[in-house]
Amino acid sequence: MITSRQNAMLKLVRKLAERRWRDKLGLFAVEGEDLVEAARAAAIEPVELLVAGENVEPALLAEVSSAAHPPRVIGVFRRADLLVGPTQDTGLALWRVGDPGNVGALLRAADALGPAFVALSEGCADPTGPKALRASAGAIYRVPTCAFEESPRPWVALVPRGGAPLAELGPDGRATFVLGAEREGLPGEVLAECDERATIPLSPTAESLNVAMAGTIALYEASRRS
């Protein structure tokens, strides 16, 4: 039973709250029984497992948790055990999407409407960070990820206006949908690399869609044609 704040495993979990340590160690911490069980269902086992009341004092586990309501279980996993891709012809390529909630939600959409991959550029939120993990609802274990530039062609830029209607996609819907951060959008150099531009028609009173909603709609449209 862990009874000291100075325990090495508790120190590790604290470190893994920071991206620099996740990058350096190749590990990430997962909070909550549902997310840990989702990993096991995908045949991914934790390298360490802390269970309140079994091998660690509950108050100490609560101290290292990042959740509003501390979990009963925290598992430490290897990034190397996650799926890498792309292993499909359809997916999302995210350009500097820095909000971890959006990154997690897009992973969840790729899981629900796939099979699909998610590619991430530099500057994107870490999909193995606490907020992204919670938003992905376990999809991180089932959706392959890759670097932005590894996304297969064709690239279809989702733009707020001026693109072809999304419903006019090719007959099989296979594409990499390229999305930018909500405020900045896609820079000119990325748009120049894209093969097509598509726009989701909105009502006249709506300004734009959240990036997670736009990506979800694009994957749904692609799934209807696959």
Feature roles, as predicted:
Residues 80-164:
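RNA substrate-binding interface of SAM-dependent RNA methyltransferases
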Residues 38-39, 63, 102, 128, ...:
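Phosphate- and divalent-cation-binding pockets in alpha/beta enzyme and binding domains
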Residues 30, 100-104, 205-213:
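Short, conserved micro-motifs enriched in small and acidic residues
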